[in-house]
């Protein structure tokens, strides 16, 4: 579960390395986000020469969480880190590569470009 002030790894090559959650989108009193949810975040660490800079406010979709997600068949999927991919308003990623595995739940959320770029979908 990702909430306000949570720091996340960035799993793409947009130039950001770490982001801090500002707000969870999707409802007025929503406190937590899970895999496939969109957040507004601030870039805390960035690589030089990247598309996004430190201090930029960006939208991101969560692709991995330590808490994990429950599947309809009763199984759970958990990851070793909390990670997100920076996206544009039309749900396409800002970067051109995705690093690490992503969850299958992104396919139902309409993030097919992220799923197709990912090296592994679990």
Curated annotation (Swiss-Prot):
Output the Pfam families linked to this UniProt entry.
Ribosomal_L14
Q: Which InterPro entries match?
A: Ribosomal_uL14 (IPR000218), Ribosomal_uL14_bac-type (IPR005745), Ribosomal_uL14_CS (IPR019972), Ribosomal_uL14_sf (IPR036853)
Q: Which GO terms describe its cellular component?
A: cytosolic large ribosomal subunit
Q: Which GO terms describe its molecular function?
A: large ribosomal subunit rRNA binding; structural constituent of ribosome
Q: Does the keyword rRNA-binding apply?
A: yes
Gene3D superfamilies the UniProt entry points to: Ribosomal protein L14
Biological processes, Gene Ontology terms: translation
Q: Does the keyword Ribonucleoprotein apply?
A: yes
Q: Which cysteine pairs make disulfide bonds?
A: none
Q: Which domain of life is it from?
A: Bacteria
Alphabetically sorted, this entry's keywords are: Ribonucleoprotein, Ribosomal protein, RNA-binding, rRNA-binding
PANTHER family noted in UniProt: 50S/60S RIBOSOMAL PROTEIN L14/L23, LARGE RIBOSOMAL SUBUNIT PROTEIN UL14M
Question: What NCBIfam families does UniProt report for this protein, alphabetically?
Answer: rplN_bact (TIGR01067)
Name the family the entry cites.
Answer: Belongs to the universal ribosomal protein uL14 family.
Describe its partners and assembly state: Part of the 50S ribosomal subunit. Forms a cluster with proteins L3 and L19. In the 70S ribosome, L14 and L19 interact and together make contacts with the 16S rRNA in bridges B5 and B8.
Q: What role does it play?
A: Binds to 23S rRNA. Forms part of two intersubunit bridges in the 70S ribosome.
State the protein's name. Large ribosomal subunit protein uL14
Source species, please?
A: Streptococcus agalactiae serotype V (strain ATCC BAA-611 / 2603 V/R)
Q: Which gene encodes it?
A: rplN
């Amino acid at each position: 579960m990702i909430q306000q002030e949570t720091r996340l790894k960035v799993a793409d090559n947009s130039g950001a390395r770490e982001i801090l959650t500002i707000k969870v989108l999707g409802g007025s009193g929503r406190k937590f986000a899970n895999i496939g949810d969109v957040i507004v975040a601030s870039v805390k660490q960035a690589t030089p020469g990247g598309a996004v800079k430190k201090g930029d406010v960006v939208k991101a979709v969560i692709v991995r969480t330590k808490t994990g997600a429950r599947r309809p068949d009763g199984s759970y999927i958990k990851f070793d880190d909390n990670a997100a991919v920076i996206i544009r308003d039309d749900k396409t990623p800002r970067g051109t590569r995705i690093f690490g595995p992503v969850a299958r739940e992104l396919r139902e959320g309409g993030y097919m470009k992220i799923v197709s770029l990912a090296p592994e979908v679990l």
